[in-house]
Amino acid sequence: MKVRLAKTAAFCMGVRRAMEMVLTEANKGKGSISTFGPLIHNKQVIDLLESKGVTSINDIDEFNEGTLVIRAHGIPPDQRKALRESGLRLIDATCRRVARVQSIIRYHTKKGYTAIIVGDRDHPEVIGLLGYGNGRAHVINSLEEVSRIPDTEKVFLVAQTTQDEEKYRDIIEAVMARFPDALTFDTICDATINRQKEIRSFIGQVDAVVVVGGYHSGNTKRLVQISQEAGLPTFHVETEKDLDKERLSSMEVIGVTAGASTPNWMIKNVVQEIEAIRTRQETFFGRWIKNAFKFMLLSNLLVAFGGFALAHAASVLSGRTPDLIHPCLALLYIYAMHVLNRFLDKGASTYNDPERASFYRRHRVFLILSGFFSMIGALALSYYLGTTIFFAIAGLSILGIIYSLPIVPVSLRHLWRYSKIKDIPGSKTLSVALAWGVLISLLPLLEPTSLAWPAAILSFLFVFSIVYVRSALFDIFQVQGDLIVGVETLPIVLGEKRTLHLLKWIILCGALLLSLAALTKVVGPFSWLLLLVFFSFTLCLIIYQKRWLYPGTRLEAMVEGNFFLAGLLALLWQIFS
């Protein structure tokens, strides 16, 4: 079944910030931590936080010591004052958009204005906003309630940040008709507006809409309401288990969106479950092709064959005579390391890629055995190439295995917070890129050949740069799961925006280096052709940034496809040069 996923389906800025603050604090493991009220309205996320030792309290007397986090919805000023006087360490995770509305209300009510808040009376955000009204605030939730606003000279309007934009506009018109001098403020969050617009854009494009989010989440329920009012068959689900597969099976294209407090892994689970539903029009052959491709991707065979293709391209770039031994060595080593490290580090994949985690559980024996025999095969091939290469591959294999294993004794961990190599911030991306570069470009220098060092070094830098970009891009896709388990990958250390900026610079520098090497005759003119690989990676970055594709099977396959592009260019160069 085809799925059209909304570009805006993910945590909003405020929820993401609150989650990052809480998880970062929880991963430090320094004392107890609680949130003052549920951090966000999503049962699965709250359960996750509880598994990390983060509890939720509603009364300050329930918490005596430790760190207390103010929820994303914000709280009234009298509660904030009480928390400050409690002596507890406070972390303010109030959404910045909510804080702006609080400031508007506080400022104008002090000037003698009466605040009209358009929102849900019982919602925590609205309760907090009322507290800033200095006794001069009223809440309304419909056009009918405009007539109940007390007569007053100075009025201003604000909205709960997750309100329906069209409804707010209608209420503004009604209030302006009664209070012509009323001040109005656009306080609905951009993320909320964009989600609502995208729901309406589904009209005529999809057969039905699935909205993923908590049953008690106000903004999620509003998306459901907007979808229903647009005349679209609408299904509100919390998890993939809530899907009505029987009804969905009669449809062809399903639109999927999610509330602002719905994490990526829940959206992925729902999307994958919908995609797995067989429609009446789907052919056996088409389904077989799709399943075969997915098997290649989930089993890491796709990235391994990508390594094969990249090794062939690197041999042509460095001036070596292309053969099958070196690409096969790369294929076997890369497959073994990816598979075995998946089993050694299962935590983050549960959240980053639930489908792959499930695949690994189902095919555990096959994958472990195939990974083990791939390593044996890599060692056998390396021995054929010489004892020096054999020991080099053995060393790389040992480093690859211990990457995910604790190497610092428990008794010494109080002196050094990183017990594993992978715990070192940013080490994952760097380690993968170095391993690929050494394996594909530098190991051949240990063989008794007349390979030129400058060409080999350039080949190493080419492989290192594109593998680094690939690994960092996957780290961006997987940031939520890594944050949950406490892995400090590059995007967590630098932030997504800076990481993407860094990747663009790496692509630019790599392209300039290839061009310079071709101009100075360090390598042959084939390097001009490889500029297409950097262009293709740039396209992948743009596709992600513009949200033309959501992180998932198709985008991952597109990223991995860059290695095959390099191999194809090398093959074409051999044929036609």
Name these PLM-found stretches.
Residues 309-329, 378-391, 441-461, 515-526, ...:
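Helix-coil boundary and interhelical linker segments in multi-pass alpha-helical membrane proteins
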Residues 338-372, 465-509:
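Solvent-exposed interhelical
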Residues 356, 421-422, 527-577:
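Extended hydrophobic alpha-helices typical of membrane-associated regions
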Residues 294-317, 370-373, 432-440:
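The first (N-terminal) embedded transmembrane alpha-helix
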